[in-house]
Amino acid sequence: YAGNLENFKEIENNPNYKFIKCDIRDRKKIDEIFHLYDIDVVINFAAESHVDRSIEEPEVFLTTNIIGTQVLLDAAKKFWKVNPNDKYCKEYKPGVKFLQISTDEVYGALGKTGMFVETMPLMPNSPYSASKASADMIVRAYHKTYGFPINITRCSNNYGPYQFPEKLIPLMINNCLKEKELPVYGDGMQVRDWLHVSDHCSAIDTVLHKGVDGEVYNIGGNNEKANIDIVKLIIRTLGKSENLIKYVKDRPGHDRRYAIDNTKITTELGWKPVYTFEQGIKETIQWYLDNTEWIENIVSGDYV
């Protein structure tokens, strides 16, 4: 439901771009795609990702995020093996890689101090994060069992242009512009690290080309913020009243704080985030102001 072909307008005429609509769980279709195209890299962004929806409808998260990932793994393994007829073959075509895009939510919650590092055990607390943790473990198992070439990245909260308006920042911007209530869970003091989408993309590109086979890399923006502080910043920037804020009952199992240690990717692969939150949120708010038609199409459902 969150997919929008308008987001691909800039690249739709690129000869390297091909859009195929299908269900990630459809083994026959996925195999067909691998058969038709010379695919040497899979970057698996495909996922149900909204925690609230996972609480209401966990099954679709489990089947999409877990089974869907396994379907992709099986197809890639089959088409990338040097000897497809040898089920024990652990040799793959040169340059192939499966890059699983995951989330810091798989680690669970932190107290007032500390940060997530890649060696921490996975302790997910929502159906969404549990489904992503499960997918991560399956990807890892394919590497350990079949010698399959993989990397896993775990990022903090993303923000920036083109984000579906069920997410915190675009939701608050859109509601502010319409003078609608701004729903804030609990006391609003849940803390998240925020990563601009451009920084996330550059990190993924870095891991794709430099990542050590089998390794996990945390991707963080070094921008810890409480939810309520972000809401108030958006209100101030748009010149609205804090009376729009409505504190609502907290989400079940709501993690209090996430913080991500990105030392591994910065020291070993040479990546670092470019955006400060102050710069990124200013540009993001301006993008939504400049693209009201885009967000109206989303909210109205006309984009479907």
Residue ranges and their predicted role:
Residues 1-158, 283, 288-304:
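N-terminal Rossmann-like NAD(P)+-binding domain of SDR-like oxidoreductases, especially those catalyzing
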Residues 4-7, 103, 112, 168, ...:
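Activation loop
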Residues 22-25, 29, 170, 176-304:
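C-terminal substrate-binding subdomain of Rossmann-fold SDR/epimerase-dehydratase oxidoreductases
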Residues 69-70, 133-140, 170-173, 201-202, ...:
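Conserved active-site helix of classical SDR/Rossmann-fold NAD(P)-dependent CH-OH oxidoreductases
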Residues 110-111, 161-163, 167:
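Short beta-loop-alpha junction of Rossmann-like oxidoreductase domains
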Residues 132, 154-157, 162, 192, ...:
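Short, cationic motifs built from Arg/Lys/His that form the positively charged side of catalytic pockets
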Residues 145-149, 165, 210:
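Short coil/turn segments at alpha/beta junctions that flank glycine-rich nucleotide-binding fingerprints
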